Structures are given as C-alpha cells and as structure tokens.
UniProtKB/Swiss-Prot annotation:
Name of the protein in its database record: Exonuclease mut-7 homolog
GO MF, any single term: nucleic acid binding
Compositionally biased region (Basic residues): 667-678
Positions with biased composition (Polar residues): 683-692, 706-719
Pfam family, one: DNA_pol_A_exo1
Disordered: annotated segments: 1-22, 644-719
Record key words, sorted: Exonuclease, Hydrolase, Magnesium, Metal-binding, Nuclease
InterPro entries, sorted: 3'-5'_exonuclease_dom, Exonuclease_MUT-7-like, Mut-7_DEDDy_dom, RNaseH-like_sf, RNaseH_sf
Annotated 3'-5' exonuclease domain residues: 575-629
Enzyme class: hydrolase
Assigned protein family: Belongs to the mut-7 family.
Amino acid sequence: MSKSNNVAPPCRQDQLGFVPAGYDSDNNSEDEMLMVMPNASTSSGESGRCFDDERIKIVPHIGWRAGIGDRDFDIELDENIANWFEGFRDSFKTFKKGPLISQRLQMFYMNTRNPYEWSLKLFANCPDHNSPKSNSLAYTVLEEMRNFKKHYNLGTDQLVDDNLRMVAFNFVAKQGHCLLFRMVVDIFEFLQCRDLFIPKVREMIARKQYKEAGQIAIDLELFEEFDEHDFVMPLFMQDKISIAEDYLNKAERLQGPVVQLLDSFFDKRQSVESHCSRYITEHEVTDVYYSKLHQKPLSKLVQRLAKNYNIPRQFTPNVNKMKNFGALQFLVHKRYYEKSLNKDSWDEMVRDTVSETDRELQLELVCLCSNFNDQPEAAKWAFHYQLKRSDLPLLVQDYILEQEGNKQAPRTDFDDEQWDAPDSEPAHTLRLDESHVHLVDSKDKFYAMLSDLCRQSMIAFDSEWKPTFGGANEVSLIQLATWDDVYMIDVMVSQLEPLDWAALAKNVFNRDDVLKLSFAPSTDISMFQKALPSFNVMYSSQSTSAILDLQLLWRHVERFDSFRFPYHEESVNQNLANLVRLCLGKKLDKSNQFSNWAQRPLRKEQLRYAALDAFCLLEIYDAIEKQLTHIQLDPNEILNALLNDVRPPSDSGTRRAGRQDGSSGSRRNHRDKYNKRHAYAEDSNSGNSSRAHQNRTKSKGAGLREQQTFEGPNTKSVL
C-alpha cells in the first residue's frame, strides 16, 4: 500500500485550519487502516493538544487482501508497462472506446504471459476502477480481455487458479455493476468453482447487503445453497421484488415455502403489518420499505407468485379467504347499494364465491344480508349451507321462528318472489327477432358466420367474461352484430383452433374497409390478446384496422356547440348505459353484466343481454350520424379524423357548405375508402343512412349468402 511520509501532525493542521488529504474522524471500516496520534507536536517544537478521536484514514489499494486467505495481490506495474499505460490512458481520454483503443489493448494482451492476470493489474491501475461505467477505461480493459479470450479461444486451465478468480471477484463484487460482474464471471469462468464464493456471499448477507448477495447468487447460479431467509424474504421486505423473483424463478425448491410464508402473514389473528414487523425483528432486516408492507400489495404479490409457480390453492388458504371475503363484500355492495345485480346474477355469483366448505364465509354472507334487513335472503342462504341455527344472527333466528310459527317451512326457493324491485322506466330491448341471434359453438357455424361478416361494411363487437376478483380473466363470449344478425361465439365450447381465430382477425377485424364499432375496446382487445394470442387484432394509432371507439366519438361530438343528442340527459359518467339514454331514450339494463359467464348453459337473460350489448352500438352510431347530418356536419370527415388519430376540425370546418374540395392526402385516401363502402355521394341526396347502404351491399351478394346460409341453433333453440 502507498503511504505518505510527510504527514503533518493533526494538532498543527487544526491550528492552521487545514485538513490533510485522507483525514477523517469517522469510525473505521474493515478495509481501512487508522493511525491515532495523541499529544503530537509541531515541527517547531510546539506541542499541541490532540483529541483522542482524531484519526488519519489510510485507504488501502484495491489489491489489499484480495486473494484467498486475505492474501494481497500485487497491482504495481514495472517501469516500462507503467509508461505505456500512462500513454494509453491519455489516448483513451482523446479517442474513447473504439478500434484504436481495442487494437492497442489486444496487442498488449498478446505480448503478455498471462493476459488474465495483467487485465486485473490494468483494471486496478485505472483511475475509475471504483465506479466503472460501461464507457469507462476500467470497463474497457476487461471488455477487451473478454473479446481477446473469445477471438483466440483462450483457455483458463493453465492460466487461472482459484486465487486469481478470488481477486477478480473482489475487484468487481463491490462495484454493484451487474454487467461488469457477469462479464468477469464469463472471463474467469467462475461457474467452474462457484462454491469458492459462497462464504463471500454469506459475508454480504451478514452485512445486510441483500441486493448484492441476491444478484451474485443469481449470476453464480447458487440456487441450492441458500434458504428463503438469507436474502429472498429480506428483499421482499425492502421492496426489491425483481431480484427476489429472479432468484426464485430458478430456485424451485424455495417457491412453495416462500409463498406459504407470505400467505401466513394474512392470518386474521394479527394484522399483516404486525406479522411483517415480527418477521423483520426476528431476522434483523434493515432498510425496510414499510409503505409496501400492507394487505393490498402483499396479497397481489402472493397471488402472482402462486400463479407463476403453479402453487396449489391449498397452500395459500389465508389469501384465498381474504380474497373471497373481499369478493363477497363487493357482491353485496353491487346488490344492495348499486342495485345493479338481478336475482339470477346474484345467486350464481354467490354460489361461485362462497364454497360449500367455508363455514366462516357462509356465516359472513348471512350476516351481511341480515345487516341490510333482508332476513328472507339471509334465511335462504342459512338453509342452503345448512348452518346451525344457534350461529345465526338473532334477527335471522327470529325470522325463521316466525315462519315456523305460521306453520310454514322457511322458504329456500324464492323464484316466485318479486325479488327485484319494480322499475317503471322502460328498458331498451333488442329489435331483432330471436331467430337472428345465433350461438356459434362449432367450426361449421363459425365459418358460416365468417362468410357473412366478410361481406359487411360495418359491424359492432363486444365480449363477456366471468369476474374473477384478482385472478386472470378469460374471455367466455364474443358478440359480433350486423343490422340483420347477432353472432355470439362461445369461446369455451367452440373448440376453435389458432388458424380459425387468425382467419377472423385477418378477414374482419384487421381490414380497413370494414368499420368496427365498439365502446372502449382497449379492454376487450387486451383480453383477446391474453386468452387468444392467434386472434391478433391490431388496434393502435399506427394501425389501419378501422376500429372506432364510440366513447371517443362521444367526446368529440360534444365539442361542437351545435350538436345535440336526440334525448338530452344530464350524465356524470361516460358509460355505455348513459350513451344509450342519450341516443335511444331508454335505459340499458346491465343487471346481467356482472354474472357467471363461464357457466354452461348460459341463461336466456344472459344471451339476450349479450346480443343487445353489441347491437345497440350500431343504433348509437346511426343516431349520432343522423344528428351530425342534420346540423350539416360531415360524419365521414369526423370519422376519418378519429380513425387516423387526427383532431377533428372545428364546427365550421366540417360543414358541407363551407368545405373545400382539397384536403390532406392521408385523410382523403381514408375517406375515399369509406365513401366507397357507404356511397355517401349518393346517399346524402336521398337521405339514406349507412344502414340503407349496408342493405344494398348485402343484396349484391345475395347469391353467395344463399349458398352459405347460417344454420341454427339460434336463440329459439337455446333460450
């Protein structure tokens, strides 16, 4: 190590107001040598007072104790190499990384006996070896060593021993540079003797350096040597989840124990925060991220890990119970507060959420119903789950006694009861005959549907799936509506293959000459991509798939001062039900939306709801189009501006009377395609709507349609 021979006494320096380089009064660390000089005197013979805690810190060079058994590694360069390296550093300052620097380093390594050893010596003499970035000199020295080894297929058997590997490890392990460490692992072939570094990783764990220990264990593939308490759980406590998960992905033996341990934090006898605090205290975890140690983020973590590692549900009982309690409370909120669940939807979702074996959750259901003064419903579920009468709330017990006193058995079937409150407001209904609503549950029906859809100029689409309360949702039903028919693809039973879904995407959804209507389609398309990867629907500002978001159209037409919906209503939320009110003057019954779409067969009400949910989109677009035409605004120009992700022009800019023939190329081209589909040049004078044009288009292909008619079953057979 290098020491200065001209160190002024600390007392004198204090009097002069200067502090020598390297002077510090901090506590010493394991890599520092401290010199305490009490009662020192100045060079003039004057004695000065010196404090006991004043110390001179002498920082050793990087090679100190770098080898096995704390042996030093000589980093000094002989005079010739030192002179060469000084010139090389000057060249690096000028040229940075590049062919010249690479060539000079390659030539240096070629003229040494052991390029592995000399690469470490050069690294140690780089001024930036303590913080080597990817464009630094220290990083470049080792990077070129890797290139040299690869180019000349240089082995390590005769040139690299365990001591040199330990030196290389100590040089880069403290830098926190993942790419640098992985490069050194590759150069010196650490994986041949990975057990050599286990004590070093344990030293890091003892120093509470969990992140560094975890990352090194991953890079050295040490997946059998550590348990969940060494650094995986502490990393979760520190919210350094990515490193912990990276390790768990390979350490399969720890996946189950870690998930079970995290699940134990949700034992209802104590709060999640209390369980975490106890673990932190017992294992002396430092740098804890307390703001993430509560129920919501940790429950999501447990569910994600359990899903990724295929952990059976019985290994996460506490999180499952918590999730079911939350789901039940959500159902109660929708039923009794929002009043948006009808009886059938409520019953099937309760049965799906409350299992036949979970007595605690069954009793919670009865209590919640009783709290809303719905004693008949509470009694119904008490008898359904055969709960002990003594465990029931007193109000429910009294209700059952009253029924028995009237010599009537407590009712378990409430089908005849007017369970849903009557509503005087009429609801919007499907105007198509049920014979035109088709359930597509086979390949033959699928391709008959596809033959019809390929001839359409405009369709509407929607989808339904079963709510899973935090789990993965999967599409159950896809609805496709034209003015004449509604097709409902039963995703769960149709047994369609990837090529079939790809054909639907190519021939309908990704065609720019077929206008597709939807309401907030991002969610539906995202579900398609997750559940049906081959059903690759392109929907972005760069695509030309002609998918129109009616919610986006709603926002744009409201900017025009002269635009009025056919039925003016004050709406707070821009949802589909409110848009139906504005355009069609009736409410949209959504009481079947939140129901079990995974059960088979589907109920009649579910099928009617699903068909109407798609068909009403056509009616909405038709109503908005007519209103725009009525106030002399060009619907086609607004449509193409939205499809091309261009801000629609102002009120005056879209008026037919004031519009010039010239327009931008991209918008005009897209408008020309749409004009060909809808023949606006002819229909604008005759007053025909887009529906009239669609009927005309379909009549042209009548011959083909007669050859490939859709053959049942329709809702007459399935409803």
